[in-house]
Amino acid sequence: LTVVGLAAAVLLLVTASAALRPGFGHGIDVSDEGLYLVAADAPSPRYNYVGLWGVYLHPLFALVSYDIAHYRLIGAVLLALAAWAAARGMGTLLRGWSADGVGPGRGTQALLDLVAVTASLAYYGLYLITPSYNWLALLGALLVTAGLMPLLVPPRSRRRTWVSAGVLALGCFVGFMGRPTAGVGLALGSLLMLLLVSQRSWRERRFATLVVVAVGLALVGAHLLLVLGPSDTVDAFRRTAYFATEDLTSHTFGDLVAQSLAQLSALPARVQKVAGWSPLLGLLVLLAAFLPRRRRPVAVTGITAAALAIVGAVVWQRHGFGGGALFTTTLPYAGYALLITALGAALGAQAIARVPDLGVVVARDDLGDELRSRPSWRWFAVASSLVVSAMLYAFSSNNGFVQQQAGAFVLLVLATVALALAATDTRGALVVLVVVAIVAGVGVTSSLRAGEARGYRTAPPDQSVVEATVSHRGATILVGPEYAAFYRDLDSAASAAGFTVGTPVIDLTPFSPGVGYALGAEPPTTLMLGFSPPVARWALDQQDQAAWHGAWLLLAPGSTRGIDPTKVVGAVGRSFPADYERVASLVWPWATQTFELWRPKAP
């Protein structure tokens, strides 16, 4: 069984990687990925684009000499390594909480590693390959998982405690830089897990907590001393808060919470639409109650594995094998279908094993003692923490609270494993992991195939056959012929009109920072989005007025989402169109959007 599981897991990882591979050197989106590149290549750390994530992506981008294909590749490798580390942390729990005290063999651990690494590739389902704030948030959540799990079992050495606590603190810091709400939530959740779930003595838990706090404070101190000073950091988050609450959609924090709760309330119906009633199959473990007690563990393991396999087959048969265009948005609901199946199995197993002991459970008034004394309930706590991490990763996303969790599919898969282990104990880990490896691997591969076939606001990889220079640093990417013509015409028209690298550009299109990045334009110190003249004026008010008086304009005439320049350029002491002349009109092939480049007239 181990050999079969490993062979299947390796095959699915290779297949998923093959579906992702073209994305590294093919295609680029001037909207989202344009923003990611501008933020990672900003002139200084004081440039803020809804958070400080670009500051911490810049060293990675610089490491590969601003080569976009290599930057994407190293991002995928780092995410896979973080997923592998999270799987190793889960393996520590398997060993520490096993009934025999020995835990799984190397084959089972290797299978868990492959499951996590393959599931992490689901982050790229939309084929947005360039590292971003989402990438940092997921990386942080995986590092938190890798650091937290070993701290839930008795310590093997002080050195290991230091390492695990340090990784946990680093994960919270990285997650915070990706999404501040995620970083805060990860830190608070980890503290609760240490206090309530860890099997360590109070002294050891206190020591681990102090190490986490100390390392976290050291990271914050290093940031304030070496990266960005206190006043600039506060200003950066002030601007981030402005965009989070007063931006183009006018969302307040309360609005985001309300939207998230609304999507959660609709989750059961969406899961039912994706998987039918198959997730209820996990409750069939209750049938094991009719068997002799010595046969129940084997029956529970078999029923749990079979239920997960059937749910996976139902979902993938409906949505996955063809790599359908909508499959990426289906993936989080598929993850929750598996999660509900494992939850039903775990609750059923607990009903069989724990109901006779109910009086003992009720007599306990210390939740921490209860969680620490019963391995099955500890697995429930671990699964809950992983699901909450996925939710924190997705909170505040424009893609929707639940749909955004497609990127955190790896956390939902690990939570499913934890709940399945609550049902089967670690003795059933191998069987469960073989099924999860196949089900999750097929889902991720299908998601990536869907992304590869579609392309994200650009030509699909198989149509991207012409090399184009998409960066003022000379980085090249293979794009569709019409996209290559756009970049070529943009460069020639701008150069002929006298544009030089470092010239400011006021981007009043719906959202196309990649165009300015290709030209080498000086970006604003604060993100300017289309849709809202007040936000654009607010951003311009923070620029050097003398320098930006000579800024060029990038417009999208005819777009209902662009900004009317007559309502904005007064912030730099000009009027439109009297003070400008059009020098280029180009069509971006995606959605055939027309872009116009306007040069300021000499005084």
Pin down the residues of each PLM region:
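Membrane-lumen/periplasm interface segments of specific transmembrane helices
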Residues: 208-293, 309-318
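Extracytoplasmic catalytic/substrate-binding loops of multi-pass membrane glycan-assembly enzymes
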Residues: 17-37, 45-60, 65-69, 230, ...
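Transmembrane-helix motifs of polytopic, lipid-linked glycan transferases
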Residues: 73-106
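Short periplasmic/luminal acceptor-recognition loop of GT-C membrane glycosyltransferases, typified by
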Residues: 444-533, 551-562, 586-591
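Aromatic/acidic, Gly/Pro-rich catalytic loop(s) in extracytoplasmic/lumenal soluble domains
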Residues: 551-603
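Specific aromatic-rich, kink-prone transmembrane helix
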Residues: 136-156, 164, 411
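Perimembrane helix-loop-helix junctions
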Residues: 185-221, 291-294, 422
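Membrane-interface alpha helices of multi-pass inner-membrane proteins
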Residues: 161-180, 185-191, 216-219, 386-395
